[in-house]
Amino acid sequence: MGHPPLEFSDCYLDSPDFRERLKCYEQELERTNKFIKDVIKDGSALISAMRSYSSAVQKFSQTLQSFQFDFIGDTLTDDEINIAESFKEFAELLNEVENERMMMVQNASDLLIKPLETFRKEQIGFTKERKKKFEKDGERFYSLLDRHLHLSSKKKESQLLEADLQVDKERHNFFESSLDYVYQIQEVQESKKFNIVEPVLAFLHSLFISNSLTVELTQDFLPYKQQLQLSLQNTRNHFSSTREEMEELKKRMKEAPQTCKLPGQPTIEGYLYTQEKWALGISWVKYYCRYEKETRTLTMTPTEQKPGAKQGPVDLTLKYCVRRKTESIDKRFCFDIEANERTGTITLQAPSEANRRLWMEAMDGKEPIYHSPITKQEEMELNEVGFKFVRKCINFIETKGIKTEGLYRTVGSNIQVQKLLNAFFDPKCPGDVDFYNSDWDIKTITSSLKFYLRNLSEPVMTYKLHKELVSAAKSDNLDYRLGAIHSLVYKLPEKNREMLELLIKHLVNVCEHSKENLMTPSNMGVIFGPTLMRAQEDTVAAMMNIKFQNIVVEILIEHFGKIYLGPPEDSQVPPVPPPRVTARRHKPITISKRLLREKAVFYTPSLDDVEDEIHHPTPNGTIASNLDPPKQLQHLKLPMQKSGEMDPGRKSPSRPVSDCQTEPCLEADMGKLVYRLQDGGTKAIPKASNGPVPGSGHTKTSSFHIKRPAPRPIVHHKEGDTDCFSKVRPPGEKQTIIRPPVRPPDPPCRSSTSQKPESKPETVSSNAEEIPSSVVASRTRFFETASRKTGSSQGKLPGDES
């Protein structure tokens, strides 16, 4: 379980529980800061100490493995799980090459040290400055408040007013400092997932390509690197979307701190001073009080513990509440209550007159307060005019601008958007707007469509089903995700389901042109997740679930054909699978548990062997058994496949043998890489009987310019074995970790086809596995395949049998 979110509403209350939670965040920040320093220190030692390189790698890997991400909320997305486990994977990779001498690239410092140092100094350092300001303003406010509360009511009115203004000013400054500090510390807590991992990832990438002895390991690392980059980019997109919503919530909290109440919280809570009478006089004791209006229970927690004894909270059942007359007591802001558990009257003092009125209103006192209504943005309705507007927008977009780069991501002019909406939803002549004969551009149309959907009185996917949809997206059972969302879609009201089908069908059409507009299902999920789904309460906890809303929309886009083919056979949602005991135990993408790679030994198969292989193909070539002695080693050309050319779950075919090197390729930038990984290709690549059709060459991606020994053929079990999660072993038998004989396939994509390799005796393509039922699962399917094949045996050299 991670840290609970720090609600902005708690900044106003400044309760002991809030301070305790804030302390946990501060400890985590210090731990992260120390971790970054360790990584920087160990990375520098790795670059400078070439002679002690092996020991430096070991220390660095231990540092990475010792760190574990904490997170906000109760569940991680698949991408966040991959990021959380990434340091463990990095450490395993470094341990594999502990005994190998490697050369460090010249720009290693720029890849690792500078980004981490920048993050530590700018982000964490800025957070510490916010902390100092928060503590300083808090100390000044409470010191002034204590002096202020001891002022006699017999002072001059001008002096009292001046003191009140000063207290209000300090309270406002402290509240703003608290809001800024909470916002900053949560932002650093979330952003460190990619700001820390990305520099280490880039450093490892340069580390492995700098030495020819580690090229084989680098080839294994590439799919993981690309998949992790995809996870980082998705997490960054979710973070950007969440940050925008949290900034809006922060602004609303600044305007009206008391308007956002969390469900299940007390009616009112805050600090009160209680008058306690003793034999030697009267004293005022500070308590943190919570009042539940339904049960009329007042819980008082002392903040000043007496030495030698720890006092717990006291629960009182309220009888009545009445304001204390000003002339009857020397203190200000007082009111009296009576409780069943105590005899006599209990006198309480509030920090201000406004706060006293809030307490009396909650306790049904004699001075209720009437809040002025909060102006609310005009809401849209899901009616015939709305359907007409959505259809006209979709028709215009698909006709005029479906190939526009950054479609829906680029924002139009607010003035033009309001002008279009006011004209279309004019009560006098609704819908009387011609999109084609006007000066409306594509950005205005897309922004207007998003504005209409976001400002519906109830979101398209309804408040009622919001929690169930988010819960389905949080499940680590990939089949359950799709089944539950499929079932919940048909629980929507008729007009909501019709509108959702209209929109998702349009988004599918947009994604089919992702090569031109660069808008993949993941990108569309980030944009339309907060648009089609919205929590009923305005809280930080709800904002943290936006990333799961994005996943719901992404699944709807990727499985549109299946979901809207008809309702599921069982109208009820499938039974909820057992919840995650801890998100850390979820199996992430991994390369550290792949099969062991041995030195490659190849031979020229005889004609009989080739014929036998044709009739009995194996995933990676002919089984090495009862053959002639091995011949001279040959090297293998490893052309880099276009990311996304292989079906999810399909193993890469054996490579043709060649003595030539691959052509140099340039490293694509992150945005293009993520696009290629997510695009997956919507059109099948043409094939010919003798190899790829001219013009269907590979798109350039990051490559390694080396000659690599061809993998040694080994025995593989059936493809069906890859679907098993585990196999039963005798007690005491340890699991054997074996590396695969060939480079793992490139990261899977949405829908793609692999190019047919040239026909050669040594190359036999493997059988295709079934595509996973959830496209989200395709991101991690092939990484889990290698670790599940525990029953596969290693190949043997010809003549090794005894």
Swiss-Prot record:
Segments forming domain Rho-GAP: 380-564
Residue ranges occupied by any PH domain in the UniProt entry: 265-368
Site (Arginine finger): R409
Recorded GO MF terms: actin binding; GTPase activator activity; ionotropic glutamate receptor binding; phospholipid binding
GO cellular component terms listed in the entry, alphabetical order: actin cytoskeleton; cytoplasm; dendrite; dendritic spine; glutamatergic synapse; presynapse; terminal bouton
Predominant location category: other
Residue stretches of biased makeup (Basic and acidic residues): 716-732
Stretches for region Disordered: 641-663, 682-802
Cell compartment(s), UniProt: Postsynapse; Presynapse; Cell projection, Axon; Cell projection, Dendritic spine
Pfam families cross-referenced by the UniProt entry: BAR_3, PH, RhoGAP
GO biological process: actin cytoskeleton organization; cell junction assembly; cell morphogenesis involved in neuron differentiation; cerebellar granule cell differentiation; cerebral cortex neuron differentiation; establishment of epithelial cell apical/basal polarity; maintenance of postsynaptic specialization structure; negative regulation of proteasomal protein catabolic process
Regions of compositional bias (Polar residues) in chain numbering: 751-768
Tissue specificity comment: High expression in brain, particularly in the cerebellum, hippocampus, thalamus, frontal lobes, sensory cortex. Found in the myelin sheaths of peripheral nerves, chromaffin cells within the adrenal medulla, and in extra-adrenal chromaffin cells associated with celiac ganglia.
Superkingdom of the source species: Eukaryota
Keyword Cytoplasm: yes
Function: Stimulates GTP hydrolysis of members of the Rho family. Its action on RHOA activity and signaling is implicated in growth and stabilization of dendritic spines, and therefore in synaptic function, in hippocampal neurons. Critical for the stabilization of AMPA receptors at postsynaptic sites. Critical for the regulation of synaptic vesicle endocytosis at pre-synaptic terminals. Required for the localization of NR1D1 to dendrites, can suppress its repressor activity and protect it from proteasomal degradation.
The protein's name in its UniProt record: Oligophrenin-1
Cytoplasm recorded as keyword: yes
